[in-house]
C-alpha cells in the first residue's frame, strides 16, 4: 500500500460531476463507484488517471483514483502471463480540491474496502486504513492485481473491456487548525468540554441527558438554599439546560466545583461505573422528601431474588434485594447473553455441600438468582478491569445485541411479564487504553424513541467524544466495540438498555417549552450575564489604560528620577482610551480631561453603525486644523546605553506622540497600560516650538544645599547642538536666581549614576545625554563652602536602605518562639559586622553567633557559609546580589539565626550536616546539626540531644540509622550505626560545592526501653511498608528486635505494638513477607508454633541484613487513578 507519486499528473477523465446532495455530507460512511470503459486502452497509456464522482463524507470530497503506471526499475518483466508492462493502481483519494487544500494542516482517519467486481463470482477485496492529511491525500495499492488476472475472460473481472471498481469506506471527524467541526449543525447535538481527564464524566452525563426521563426529573428538582458554587442540583440543571439550548460545547467547571473538586481533581481519571453510582446516590439523597423522590428508583431500580430451593423436598429459602446496575463478568464469556445466563444459572449444592433445610435436614438444593422486576433503564457494567496478581484490562471479544430478551433470566409473574423483558440498546460507553489510563467516549442512539414510535424510522447513532459529536454507523457503535483487537484495546465498558414498553415514557422528547420556567429564567439570566461579560472583555481588548502625568505632579517628587512608580500605579487615576483612535483624538481626550470641555459631538467608539461613522468622520475633519497648547510624550522605563557602569532603569518621557488624524494609537503605544507626560506651558510663557531633529526635552531639577532637598522645577526644550552653559541665564531665570549666579551642572542618568559636568562649555548637549529626550539636568549654586553637593546627596539617598530582620531556626528548641520582626536603616557601604552587632545589642546575644542570609530555595533558607562570612563584607551583599533600585526596592528582608557558638567555627572546627529525626508521633522531620569535624556518631547524637531532649518516660538513649533516600527505598532503614563510627565515614552526599555542608542519609531516633539491650541470639530487622509490589515503598521504615527461636506470632504481636495508630481491623488486612533487594523472598503466614529461624535472616559481613520484613497494605496516598470518587456536597 502506498500513495501515488506526485509527478503522475496526466489525467484521463471527462468533467467531474457535481456532488450528490442526496447523501448526508457530514455522515460517517460513503460508497464510491467507477466503471472504466476501454480498460485495455487505459492500461496502455502510461501515467494516465481517472477519478470517480466525488462523495462528500465528513464534509470532505472522496473519490476513487485509478492510475496506469509504468513498472519501475524493471522489477517485473513481461512474460507469457504478463503481457503488459504497466501496473494498475487503485486508490482512495481524500480532499484533493484546490479550494480545500487552502485550509492548511488537516488530518482525517479513514478505513475502506477497495473492490473489483466479478461478473461470475465474488469480487477482489482489499482493505486499507490510513490517516489522510494535507500532504498525503491518496492511499491504496500501486499494483492492485496482476493485469493478466484482471483481463482474463474466464475470471470475469473485465467484461466488454469494462472494469467495475467499488469502494466502501468510513471516516472519522477531520481535525486541524482550520477545521471547525460544528457538532450542532451536523448532528443536532453538542458535546461537553474536557477539563483534563473528565472524559469518563462527560460520557455518563451524555447518557443521562438523553435519558429524558432522568433529565426531566433533574429539571424538576428543588434547588434548595445551598450557595451556587456548591449546589449540585443547580449545576446539573445548568449542564442539561446548556446541552439542550446551546449551540457550542458546554463547560462542566461549575459542576465539578459543586462536587467540591479542585482543579487538580479534574486531571484524575476515574472509573465511569463508580462515578455513575456515586452521582445517582447523591442525587437520590437530595430528592428525598420532595416530589421527585421516586424518580431515580422508578428509572433505574430493579429487584432480584436470591434463592435456595431443595430438589427432593418442598422447601425454599429466598430474599429479594434491589439493584441499580448489573455487573457481568467478561472473562471467559463471549457474549452478553451468555454472561446473563451464567449470572442466573443456579449452582447445585450436593454431597459435602448440601443445604441445611432445618427440619428437613441436609438436602440437595439449587442456589441462584432470578430477576423479579426489571427497571425501565438497565445499566449493565462489564467487568473489564480486574486484579489478578497484577492490574490488567480484559479486552476479550464480548458481543452484545441491539435487541435483548431477558425472559430466561427472570421469574415471570404478576410483577414481571414477557413484555417487560425486552430491551433495546440505547448507549454504549467505551474505554480505550489500559488499566491506569485511557479515554472514554459514548455512542448513543439518539433516534431510539422515534424508531420505536415510527417503524419506518431508523437508528441514528452518534459518537460523543468530549466536545466533538459526530454521526456514526451502527457497526461502529456496536460491533467495533466488542473488543478482542489487541492493537486497538478499545471495548465497551458499560451498556445502557431501555425496556421497549417504557421507551415512550423514558425517552420522550422534552420541548423547550416544557422546561420549568424557574430553570429557564435562571440560566437565561446567566447567559445574558455571560454575554455582557464577554462583550466587556472584547471591549477591554480594544482599549488601553493610560495615566496622565503633568508638571505639577512631578514637582511633588524630591527624590530620584521624575516620579515614583507607585505614584503612577496607585495614586494617579487611570483613563481608558480606544486603541483604534488616532493620535489627534488622544489630544482631544487630554484637552477635555485636563483643561477645558469641547463642543465636539460625542461618539461611542464601540458602535459601528453608519451614524457613528459619520459623526467620527466629522470630528476628524474638525480636528485636522485644530491647535493645542500642549504636547504628549510616551514615558518608558528604559536603560542608558554605552555607560561604563551598570545602571538602574529610569522612567522618562522618551517618545514624542505626533499629532495626526492618520496614525492610530495602537501603532504608537504598544502596551495595554501606558504613561503619558503632558508637556504644557509653564511660568506664564507659551510652549516653545519642538523640532525632533534639533531639540531635546530636558527636565530641570534643583538641589538646595541649605534645605538639603531636590525640587523638579519643570521642563525645558534645549537645542541639542549648543553647549549647556549657554542656557545658564535661562536656568537662573527659571530658578528665580540672579542672572549672574554661577551654577554647577549634573546629569542624572539613573538613580545610581549622577555625572558631574566639569566643563559645560566643552561638549554639546546631545553628547551629554546621548541625544535622548527626557534627560534630567541637576543644577546647584556653585558654592565652595557647601558641606555637600548634589552628587553626594544623591549617593547618600541611594545607599540609605531599610532592612527587615526575621529570625529563622536551624534546629529549633522545643517550644522556642522566634523574636518579633524589627527594622533598621543601614548604608549599603556599611560593614555586615555593624548589622550583627546591632542584632546582638537588640537581642542581647553575642554578635559573633549571629548568622545572616537572604537566599531562599523553595520554602527553605539555604545559607552559604563561605559567602556570608561577615568580616569585610558590605551591606550591599544583603540586596540579593541584584542592582539596588531605590524606586522599586523600598525594603529588604534579611533572615538571621542565633547559633550556640561563633559562626566562624563552621569553617574551622565544625561541619554543617542535615539528617532526619523520628518524632514521638512517628513522623519524620529534617534536622540540622553542627557536630565537630573530627567527631563520631556519639558526638552527633550529643549535638542532637541539645535541640531534641528525650520525651517524658523515654529511655533518654538515641541511635543513628542508615536510611535510603531514593524513590525505590523511600526512608528504608538499612542498618544501625556503631556509636564509634566517624562522622566523615557516614553515608552522605554534598548539598553544595562547599565541603562544609552535607546531607546524611541517616535518621536519629530515641531507643525504646525494650530495645536498649541486645542479648545473644537477638538482632534488629528492618521493616518497610509497601503496596503490592516491593518496589512501591511508602511510610516510615523502622526496626524490630527479633530473637532466634521465638514464636513468629510473638513477632507479629510486637509489630502490632509498633503501629499504635493502626486499628485492629486495618491491621488484620496486612500481609507479611520477607523481602530482599526489592524482591519477594517468601510470604510470612505466622502459623501456630512456627519459630524464627536465624538462617532466614542472616546478616551480611557488612552488618546490613540480607532480608527485611515487608508490610503489604494499601498506601494512604494511593495512585490518583485509584483514588475513590468523592462528591463532597
From Swiss-Prot:
Protein name: Ubiquitin carboxyl-terminal hydrolase 7
InterPro entries from the UniProt entry: MATH/TRAF_dom (IPR002083), Papain-like_cys_pep_sf (IPR038765), Peptidase_C19 (IPR050164), Peptidase_C19_UCH (IPR001394), TRAF-like (IPR008974), USP7_ICP0-binding_dom (IPR024729), USP_C (IPR029346), USP_CS (IPR018200)
GO cellular component, one term: nucleus
Record-annotated USP domain positions: 190-500
Family stated for the protein in its record: Belongs to the peptidase C19 family.
GO molecular function: cysteine-type deubiquitinase activity
Enzyme Commission (EC) number: 3.4.19.12
Organism name: Caenorhabditis briggsae
Positions of the catalytic residues: 199, 439
Disulphides: none
Gene Ontology terms describing biological process: protein deubiquitination; proteolysis; regulation of protein stability
Record localization: Nucleus
Function: Hydrolase that deubiquitinates target proteins.
Domain MATH: 29-169
Gene3D superfamilies according to UniProt: Apoptosis, Tumor Necrosis Factor Receptor Associated Protein 2, Chain A (2.60.210.10), Cysteine proteinases (3.90.70.10), Phosphatidylinositol 3-kinase Catalytic Subunit, Chain A, domain 1 (3.10.20.90)
Reactions catalysed: Thiol-dependent hydrolysis of ester, thioester, amide, peptide and isopeptide bonds formed by the C-terminal Gly of ubiquitin (a 76-residue protein attached to proteins as an intracellular targeting signal)
Keywords, ordered alphabetically: Hydrolase, Nucleus, Protease, Thiol protease, Ubl conjugation pathway
Enzyme class: hydrolase
Amino acid at each position: 500500500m502506498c500513495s501515488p507519486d506526485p509527478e503522475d499528473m496526466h489525467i484521463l477523465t471527462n468533467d467531474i460531476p457535481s456532488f450528490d446532495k442526496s447523501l448526508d455530507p457530514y455522515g460517517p460512511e460513503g460508497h464510491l463507484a467507477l466503471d472504466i470503459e476501454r480498460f485495455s486502452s487505459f492500461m496502455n497509456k502510461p501515467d494516465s488517471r481517472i477519478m470517480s464522482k466525488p462523495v462528500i463524507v465528513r464534509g470532505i470530497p472522496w473519490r476513487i483514483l485509478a492510475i496506469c503506471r509504468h513498472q519501475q526499475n524493471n522489477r517485473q518483466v513481461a512474460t507469457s502471463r504478463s503481457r503488459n508492462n504497466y501496473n494498475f493502481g487503485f486508490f482512495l483519494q481524500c480532499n484533493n480540491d484546490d479550494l480545500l487544500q487552502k485550509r492548511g494542516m488537516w488530518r482525517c482517519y479513514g478505513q475502506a474496502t477497495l473492490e473489483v467486481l466479478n461478473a461470475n463470482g465474488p469480487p477482489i477485496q482489499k482493505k486499507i486504513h490510513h490517516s489522510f492529511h494535507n500532504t498525503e491525500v491518496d492511499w491504496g495499492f500501486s499494483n492492485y492485481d496482476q493485469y493478466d488476472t484482471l483481463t482474463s475472460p474466464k475470471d470475469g473481472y473485465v467484461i466488454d473491456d469494462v472494469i467495475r471498481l467499488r469502494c466502501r469506506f468510513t471516516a472519522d471527524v477531520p481535525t486541524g487548525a482550520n477545521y471547525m467541526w460544528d457538532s450542532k449543525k451536523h448532528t443536532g447535538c453538542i458535546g461537553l468540554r474536557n477539563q483534563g481527564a473528565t472524559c469518563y464524566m462527560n460520557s455518563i452525563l451524555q447518557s443521562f441527558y438523553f435519558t429524558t426521563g432522568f433529565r426531566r426529573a433533574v429539571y424538576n428538582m428543588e434547588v434548595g438554599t445551598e450557595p451556587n458554587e456548591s449546589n449540585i442540583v443547580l449545576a446539573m440543571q445548568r449542564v442539561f439546560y446548556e446541552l439542550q439550548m446551546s449551540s457550542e460545547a458546554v463547560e462542566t467547571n461549575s459542576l465539578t466545583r459543586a462536587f467540591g473538586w479542585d482543579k487538580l481533581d479534574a486531571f484524575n481519571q476515574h472509573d465511569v461505573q463508580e462515578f455513575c453510582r456515586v452521582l445517582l446516590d447523591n442525587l437520590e439523597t437530595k430528592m428525598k422528601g420532595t416530589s421527585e423522590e421516586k424518580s431515580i428508583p422508578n428509572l433505574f431500580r430493579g429487584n432480584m431474588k436470591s434463592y435456595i430451593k431443595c430438589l427432593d423436598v418442598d422447601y425454599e429459602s429466598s430474599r429479594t434485594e434491589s439493584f441499580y446496575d448489573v455487573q457481568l463478568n467478561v472473562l471467559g464469556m463471549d457474549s452478553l447473553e451468555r454472561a446473563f445466563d451464567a449470572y442466573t444459572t443456579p449452582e447445585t449444592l450436593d454431597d459435602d455441600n448440601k443445604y441445611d433445610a432445618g427440619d428437613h435436614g441436609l438436602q440437595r438444593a439449587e442456589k441462584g438468582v432470578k430477576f423479579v422486576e426489571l427497571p425501565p433503564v438497565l445499566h449493565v457494567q462489564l467487568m473489564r478491569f480486574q486484579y489478578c496478581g497484577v492490574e490488567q484490562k480484559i479486552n476479550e471479544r464480548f458481543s452484545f445485541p441491539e435487541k435483548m430478551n431477558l425472559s430466561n433470566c427472570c421469574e415471570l409473574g404478576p410483577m414481571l411479564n414477557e413484555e417487560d423483558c425486552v430491551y433495546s440498546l440505547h448507549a454504549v460507553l467505551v474505554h480505550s487504553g489500559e488499566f491506569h489510563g485511557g479515554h472514554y467516549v459514548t455512542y448513543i442512539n439518539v433516534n431510539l424513541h422515534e424508531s420505536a414510535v415510527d417503524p419506518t424510522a431508523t437508528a441514528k447513532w452518534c459518537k460523543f467524544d468530549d466536545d466533538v459529536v459526530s454521526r456514526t454507523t451502527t457497526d461502529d457503535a456496536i460491533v467495533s466495540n466488542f473488543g478482542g483487537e489487541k492493537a486497538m484495546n478499545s471495548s465497551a465498558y458499560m451498556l445502557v438498555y431501555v425496556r421497549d414498553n417504557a421507551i415512550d415514557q423514558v425517552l420522550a422528547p422534552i420541548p423547550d417549552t416544557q422546561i420549568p420556567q424557574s430553570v429557564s429564567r435562571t440560566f437565561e439570566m446567566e447567559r445574558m450575564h455571560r454575554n455582557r461579560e464577554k462583550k466587556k472583555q472584547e471591549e477591554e481588548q480594544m482599549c488601553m489604560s493610560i495615566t496622565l502625568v503633568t508638571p505639577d505632579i512631578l514637582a511633588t517628587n524630591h527624590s530620584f528620577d521624575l516620579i515614583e512608580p507607585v505614584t503612577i500605579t496607585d495614586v494617579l487615576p487611570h483613563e481608558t482610551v480606544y486603541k483604534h483612535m488616532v493620535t489627534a483624538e488622544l489630544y482631544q481626550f487630554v484637552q477635555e480631561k485636563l483643561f477645558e470641555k469641547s463642543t465636539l459631538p460625542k461618539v461611542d467608539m464601540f458602535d459601528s453603525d453608519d451614524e457613528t461613522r459619520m459623526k467620527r468622520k466629522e470630528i476628524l475633519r474638525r480636528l485636522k486644523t485644530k491647535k493645542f497648547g500642549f504636547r504628549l510624550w510616551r514615558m518608558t522605563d528604559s536603560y542608558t546605553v554605552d555607560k561604563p557602569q551598570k545602571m538602574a532603569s529610569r522612567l522618562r518621557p522618551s517618545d514624542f506622540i505626533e499629532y495626526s488624524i492618520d496614525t492610530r494609537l495602537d501603532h504608537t503605544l504598544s502596551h495595554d497600560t501606558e504613561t503619558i507626560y503632558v508637556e504644557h506651558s509653564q511660568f506664564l510663557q507659551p510652549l516653545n516650538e519642538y523640532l525632533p531633529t534639533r531639540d531635546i526635552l530636558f527636565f530641570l531639577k534643583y538641589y538646595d544645599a541649605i534645605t538639603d532637598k531636590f525640587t523638579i522645577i519643570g521642563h525645558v526644550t534645549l537645542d541639542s547642538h549648543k553647549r549647556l552653559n549657554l542656557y545658564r541665564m535661562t536656568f537662573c531665570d527659571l530658578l528665580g536666581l540672579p542672572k549672574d549666579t554661577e551654577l554647577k551642572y549634573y546629569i542624572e542618568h539613573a538613580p545610581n549614576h549622577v555625572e558631574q559636568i566639569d566643563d559645560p562649555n566643552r561638549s554639546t548637549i546631545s553628547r551629554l545625554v546621548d541625544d535622548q529626550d527626557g534627560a534630567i539636568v541637576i543644577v546647584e549654586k556653585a558654592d565652595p563652602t557647601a558641606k555637600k553637593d548634589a552628587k553626594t546627596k544623591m549617593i547618600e539617598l541611594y545607599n540609605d536602605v531599610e532592612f527587615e530582620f526575621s529570625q529563622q531556626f536551624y534546629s529549633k528548641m522545643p517550644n522556642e518562639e522566634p523574636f518579633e520582626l524589627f527594622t533598621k536603616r543601614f548604608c549599603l557601604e556599611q560593614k555586615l559586622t555593624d548589622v550583627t552587632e546591632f542584632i546582638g545589642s537588640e537581642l542581647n546575644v553575642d554578635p559573633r553567633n549571629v548568622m545572616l542570609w537572604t537566599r531562599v530555595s523553595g520554602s527553605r533558607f539555604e545559607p552559604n557559609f563561605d559567602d556570608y562570612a561577615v568580616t569585610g563584607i558590605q551591606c550591599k551583599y544583603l540586596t540579593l546580589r541584584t542592582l539596588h533600585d531605590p524606586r522599586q526596592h523600598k525594603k529588604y528582608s534579611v533572615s538571621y539565626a542565633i547559633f550556640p557558638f561563633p559562626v566562624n567555627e563552621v569553617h574551622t572546627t565544625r561541619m554543617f550536616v542535615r539528617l532526619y529525626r523520628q518524632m514521638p508521633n512517628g513522623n519524620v522531620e529534617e534536622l540540622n546539626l553542627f557536630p565537630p569535624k573530627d567527631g563520631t556518631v556519639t558526638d552527633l547524637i550529643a549535638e542532637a540531644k541539645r535541640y531534641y531532649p528525650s520525651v517524658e518516660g523515654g529511655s533518654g538513649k538515641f541511635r543513628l540509622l542508615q536510611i535510603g533516600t531514593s524513590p525505590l527505598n523511600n526512608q528504608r532503614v538499612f542498618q544501625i550505626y556503631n556509636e564509634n563510627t566517624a562522622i566523615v565515614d557516614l553515608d552522605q552526599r554534598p548539598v553544595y560545592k562547599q565541603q562544609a555542608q552535607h546531607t546524611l542519609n541517616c535518621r536519629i531516633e530515641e531507643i525504646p526501653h525494650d530495645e536498649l539491650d541486645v542479648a545473644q541470639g537477638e538482632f534488629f530487622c528492618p521493616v518497610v511498608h509497601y503496596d503490592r509490589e516491593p518496589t512501591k515503598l511508602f511510610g516510615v521504615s523502622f526496626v524490630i528486635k527479633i530473637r532466634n527461636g521465638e514464636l513468629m506470632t510473638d513477632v507479629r504481636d510486637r509489630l502490632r505494638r509498633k503501629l499504635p495508630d493502626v486499628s485492629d481491623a486495618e491491621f488484620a488486612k496486612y500481609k507479611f513477607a520477607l523481602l530482599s533487594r526489592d524482591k519477594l523472598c517468601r510470604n510470612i503466614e505466622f502459623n501456630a508454633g512456627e519459630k524464627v529461624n536465624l538462617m532466614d535472616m542472616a546478616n551480611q559481613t557488612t552488618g546490613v541484613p540480607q532480608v527485611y520484613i515487608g508490610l503489604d497494605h494499601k498506601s494512604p496516598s494511593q495512585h490518583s487513578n485509584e483514588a475513590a470518587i468523592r462528591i463532597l456536597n
